[in-house]
Regions:
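Multi-pass alpha-helical transmembrane bundle typical of ion/small-solute transporters
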Residues: 1-379
């Protein structure tokens, strides 16, 4: 039970660091355009992150049963996975690098699971294809007929492909949306554009915060639920009194049907909001000031694009990176303005942080578990 409580504590600590680390992603543009002060923007982000965390548990379900084999997961393994992720978050936060908390979590989880399985690569669910039969309406006969569909999941479809495609979609979407706005607003006076989009950016910033909560807070829910599932399978809660039965969570064969306890949802939502309120000025400065000079219309375009990509990915249970999406959206908007508006030295630092996140956190998670095994703290 002590280990379960430790996992919950460390998972909430990860969520808290994710909150202040990723606060920058949801408010950088509204601060960079000077529509809100950092303090006002952080309070807005905290409120919208809290609201978003209560909507959509698809990402949590993917983390719980869609990435690694739960037979190789224990509370100790999860502590190692989370420790590596938290360390990476703090390191990149200290140096002001907008790396991915999502990929840090996935990397740490995969590395720890691999070590727990003593190098058995089957511990990681690389590709999963499930065929299911659904009833659809035949337009010719107007009758319901059986139709087979294939659902794709696993690391490749839920992490790797979205990891590559979401930044591209963010960049292209930001670029095209900004070009469209330029065409529509070409006869407007700059003063009018700034006034209108200064107000509109309050909505887009709130939308971004909501999408961030919907995507990132649910990852913590997945980790805690995974620990509870592992404890339930091990019979850890069999002798608990009835008033503690909420700790027992059975595993579902289908990740889409995995139960996420409501108390876990509430706990993670509040922790994410608290971490968001703590803020992350170092990364805000990188995104809002160093990459490209932003006006309210640019901030609106970047936030709307990024939030939409995040919301769609979250609805499909894909733990994509908020950082990747909003950063590339800002880059796309900057390139629509003029290519020279983009500062490539900053972009290179960000790219290096992206490339290193998955292997670095996977390596740390792996080594931590192997170290615990060497001291016989883990089987």
């Amino acid at each position: 039970m002590l280990l379960i409580c430790t996992v919950i504590f460390v998972a909430l600590l990860f969520t808290y660091t994710n909150g202040f680390h990723d606060t920058a992603n949801s408010i950088a543009t509204v601060v960079g355009t000077k529509v809100l002060t950092p303090r006002q923007a952080i309070l807005l982000a905290a409120a919208t992150n809290l609201a978003g965390a209560f909507f959509g548990a698809a990402v949590a379900k993917t983390i719980t049963s869609g990435l690694v084999d739960s037979n190789y997961i224990s509370s100790g393994v999860l502590v190692c996975a989370l420790s590596g992720s938290i360390g990476w978050n703090l390191l990149t936060w200290y140096y002001g690098l907008p790396s991915s908390s999502s990929h840090a979590l996935v990397g740490g989880l995969c590395g720890a699971a691999l070590a727990s399985a003593h190098g058995n690569w089957a511990a990681i669910k690389w590709i999963e294809l499930k065929t299911k039969t659904v009833q659809v309406l035949d337009p010719a006969t107007h009758e319901m007929v059986a139709n087979k569909i294939t659902e794709k999941s696993g690391i490749l479809y839920k992490v790797v492909i979205p990891m590559v495609s979401s930044p591209v979609v963010g960049f292209v979407g930001g670029f095209l949306f900004m070009l469209l706005l330029y065409m529509l607003l070409r006869r407007w006076k700059p003063v009018t554009v700034n006034r209108v989009f200064g107000k509109a950016q309050l909505l887009s910033s709130g939308y971004m915060g909501f999408s961030h909560g919907m995507s990132d807070a649910t990852k913590c829910m997945g980790i805690i639920t995974l620990a509870l599932v592992a404890g339930t399978k091990a019979g850890m809660f069999d002798h608990f009194p009835s008033w503690l039965s909420f700790f027992s969570v059975p595993e579902s064969a289908d990740p889409k049907n995995q139960i996420i306890p409501k108390w876990v949802t509430a706990l993670c939502a509040l922790t994410m909001a608290a971490g968001t309120a703590a803020g992350g000025w170092r990364i805000i400065k990188t995104l809002s000031h160093k990459m490209v000079k932003l006006q309210p219309v640019h901030g609106f375009a970047a936030e709307t694009t990024g939030a939409t990509v995040l919301a769609i990915a979250a609805s499909y249970g894909m733990p994509v990176s908020t950082t990747h999406v909003i950063t590339t959206s800002i880059m796309g908007v900057g390139c629509a303005k003029r290519l020279s508006a983009l500062k490539m030295d900053v972009v290179k630092r960000i790219l290096w942080a992206w490339v290193l996140t998955l292997p670095a956190t996977a390596g740390v998670g792996y080594l931590l578990v192997r170290g615990c095994q060497a001291f016989q703290w883990l089987p």
